[in-house]
Regions:
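Sec-dependent bacterial lipoprotein signal peptides
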Residues: 1-7
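Acidic/polar, low-complexity intrinsically disordered N-terminal segments immediately downstream
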Residues: 7-70
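Solvent-exposed, acidic/flexible segments
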Residues: 16, 20, 84, 88-91, ...
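A short, polar/charged loop/turn motif at coil->beta-strand junctions and beta-hairpin connectors
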Residues: 52-56, 87, 144
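A beta-strand/beta-hairpin structural motif
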Residues: 63-65, 70-80, 99-178
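A short beta-strand signature
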Residues: 87-101
Length: 178
């Protein structure tokens, strides 16, 4: 009853503290720089990670800026089409997940050999993809064919991550399915 709930809450709070230490140690061990503003023109230093405002323990690094526009030529007339991701776009995601420990395991869903079908969900639809970290990463990447690395706390991951209070890093890329 009451005592169990109280102990569970204390255990969760301690696990969150350990999780925050694990994230801090990961950054320290790898010599990453924590920045508080995204670089202008999407030119990121190799070791720069944005501590996303409003999400103190979510970190983002843009590796490759994707395709912001497409130019279509119809009837000899060029049309510029903005490719920014909008809510309900069907996202096709490939990723490599890694633990933040010193001898980390990596699980890869990067190619069709590793995972026949990529992870798909509609951007902004938390019923399809409960991992709020993915939605935030897509928002920050903005454009299809972008690649990034994120470090996210368990509370922003999949339900299994939340329950185990395990933070992960993800190297990810996405496309918008037409």
């Amino acid at each position: 009853g009451f005592i169990t709930t109280s102990c569970e809450q204390a255990g969760y709070a301690n696990n969150r503290k350990e999780e925050n230490k694990l994230i801090a140690n990961f950054f320290s061990r790898n010599g990453f720089n924590i920045i508080t503003e995204a670089p202008e023109n999407d030119v990121w230093g190799e070791k720069d990670y944005l501590q996303v405002p409003g999400y103190d323990d979510f970190y983002f690094h843009l590796t490759t800026r994707g395709d912001s526009i497409r130019i279509d030529s119809i009837d000899g007339k060029a049309d510029t089409i903005d490719l920014s991701v909008v809510p309900n776009d069907l996202i096709v995601l490939r990723y490599k997940r890694f633990e933040l420990t010193e001898n980390a395991d990596t699980i890869s869903y990067w190619t069709t050999l590793e995972q026949a079908y990529p992870y798909e969900f509609h951007y902004g639809n938390l019923a399809e993809c409960e991992a709020t970290g993915w939605h935030l990463a897509i928002k920050l990447m903005k454009y299809p064919n972008s690649e990034c690395t994120i470090i996210q706390p368990s509370k922003m991951g999949f339900n299994a991550d939340v329950n185990s209070v395990t933070p992960y890093g993800y190297i990810s890329k996405f496309k918008v399915k037409q």
